[in-house]
């Protein structure tokens, strides 16, 4: 999986934040929560999730260019909605060369997310 190349950078980005609990798909961390669509039975999981000391729950996803943009949009909308319910945000971590693609999708589909470069 290409995301494994960027997971350490993403973890160091999260660890700079004032966090209480960090969950990640990386080895040595508890896995983030998996959301399952009732209609399609598709599973959605963030690459990272963290809780701040105020109790807000944030989700982070490593945003890579993908031929299946619709699937990314659905995933990001679900994660954004779930983060908003817990007073948090969706953070899309875009490696160099992927930021413009990510920003275009976020803007075009009106996704409530913050795009960061890692």
Segments predicted by a language model, with ranges:
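Active-site metal-binding core of divalent-cation-utilizing nuclease and nuclease-like domains
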Residues: 1-7, 20-56
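Structural motif
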Residues: 27, 61-66, 93-96
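Conserved catalytic cores of phosphodiester-cleaving nucleases, focusing on short active-site segments
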Residues: 46-79
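Arginine/glycine-rich "motif VI" loop of SF2 helicases in the C-terminal RecA-like domain
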Residues: 80-87
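Domain-level recognition of nuclease-like catalytic cores that cleave nucleotide substrates
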Residues: 93-118
């Amino acid at each position: 999986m290409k995301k494994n190349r960027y997971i350490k950078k993403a973890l160091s980005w999260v660890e700079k934040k004032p966090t209480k609990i960090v969950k990640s798909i990386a080895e040595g961390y508890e896995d983030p929560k998996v959301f399952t669509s009732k209609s399609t039975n598709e599973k959605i999981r963030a690459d990272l999730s963290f809780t701040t000391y105020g109790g807000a729950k944030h989700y982070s996803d490593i945003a890579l260019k993908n031929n299946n943009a619709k699937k990314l949009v659905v995933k990001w909308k679900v994660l954004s909605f779930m983060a908003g319910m817990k007073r948090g945000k969706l953070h899309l971590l875009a490696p160099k060369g992927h930021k413009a693609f990510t920003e275009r999708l976020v803007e075009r589909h009106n996704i409530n997310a913050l795009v960061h470069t890692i």
